[in-house]
Amino acid sequence: MGNILQNLPAGEKVGLAFSGGLDTSAAIHWMRAKGAIPYSYTANLGQPDEPDYDEIPRRALLYGAEKARLIDCRKQLVAEGIAALQSGAFHISTAGVHYFNTTPIGRAVTGTMLVIAMKEDDVHIWGDGSTFKGNDIERFYRYGLLANPALRIYKPWLDQTFIDELGGRKEMSEYMISHGLTYKMSVEKAYSTDSNIWGATHEAKDLEHLDKGVKIVEPIMGVASWREDVAIKPETVTIRFEEGQPVALNHVTYDDPVQLVLEANAIGGRHGLGVSDQIENRIIEAKSRGIYEAPGLALLFIAYERLVSGIHNEDTIEQYRINGLRLGRLLYQGRWFDSQSMMLRETAQRWVARAITGEVTVELRRGNDYSILDTTSPNLTYKPERLTMEKGESTFSPQDRIGQLTMRHLDITDTRDKLLLYIKTGLLGPSSGNSTTLLPEPADSGTEKPPSR
């Protein structure tokens, strides 16, 4: 089971998930110089902050890659994101504002598709830039081995020799300059950013301090709605679903789900929709903090949840939410393709999402401020005539309700007996600090209690 390499495997092919940034640029040149045969794999995830994907493989070849490939992951990424949406697989929230697990969705796709591409090139050693303190090292480990059980793992940031020689940005920059190489030097920010078509994650550095917040973040998927100098006009948008699939925005149908997501991002981004600030538990149980953007997914989720609430009954919605919380944790932990996740996903997609057909019209204002203006669906079980307060023919009568309330008396009596028992044992009452008070039970209620059995 010793598939984690702590030293560079000289003379062997090593696949590197290559971003084109300073760290992977220095790593790929260093690996070649030390005798390994580096292969470069770059995932096109629709990152909103990447201007030229085609340039990345060219830089990898310049820095010493034996072969450099660009893998278009957008279609699969959108499909997995819609599956998460349909399942409500979002377990992290603060006061009802969700983190939409956009990075875990991206890792599920990257971790499998890049390793599959490596197998095509007979590359069975994989490296990437994840560190030992984060979630990604475990996510990539799991997904990589699912895609290739013969995979071995080499991460430069687990190799002490690499750390000693190139352990910081200053050392990596000096290394590249000393070898006459240019590289993509990102602007030094007060935090780090990772993104894909579904969302952006901002964390680390200054954002590790809870007295720093969203106001230091420059969003990459929309406007900074918290800034007073940013003008945002209200906008009405209509979202259509067919059998759980988002298919139209503002009555424009999209045959390509990728284009629909891009348009949803543009619409939501104009308002700063889907920004959240979360404290969360990493896989290793230590807490971290992130500020997230997900404008398109937030927009689709508003419409999807509205239709769920109007179409399904209370017990189905409750189970959908319970399963979604569990599935969200599994997704976060890198278990999106485990059997327990597949079971929960299939349940939601079959029995919840397939009924979700209809349109929702929303007015977007600033940030996460919105109003739902209209909801239509052929599958709505919301029927106002059943409960209308206006005079007219009713689906049930006052006598029907009297009968229903009479039946309720059975469990009310049982509940009262339990409360009296709790008072008698001291669980309730002034001494327990509980404010619940009950009238004393009448000495003779005139009703004989049935014998206990």
From Swiss-Prot:
Family under the similarity heading: Belongs to the argininosuccinate synthase family. Type 2 subfamily.
Gene Ontology cellular component annotations, sorted alphabetically: cytoplasm
Keywords: Amino-acid biosynthesis, Arginine biosynthesis, ATP-binding, Cytoplasm, Ligase, Nucleotide-binding
Biological processes, Gene Ontology terms: argininosuccinate metabolic process; L-arginine biosynthetic process; urea cycle
GO molecular function list: argininosuccinate synthase activity; ATP binding; protein homodimerization activity
Quaternary structure (record): Homotetramer.
Subcellular location: Cytoplasm
Disulfide pattern: none
Official protein name in the record: Argininosuccinate synthase
Coiled-coil region: none
Encoding gene (name): argG
Binding site for L-citrulline: 99, 135, 139, 192, 201, 203, 280
Pathway: Amino-acid biosynthesis; L-arginine biosynthesis; L-arginine from L-ornithine and carbamoyl phosphate: step 2/3
Binding site for L-aspartate: 131, 135-136
Pfam families: Arginosuc_syn_C, Arginosuc_synth
Binding residues for ATP: 17-25, 43, 129, 131, 136, 194
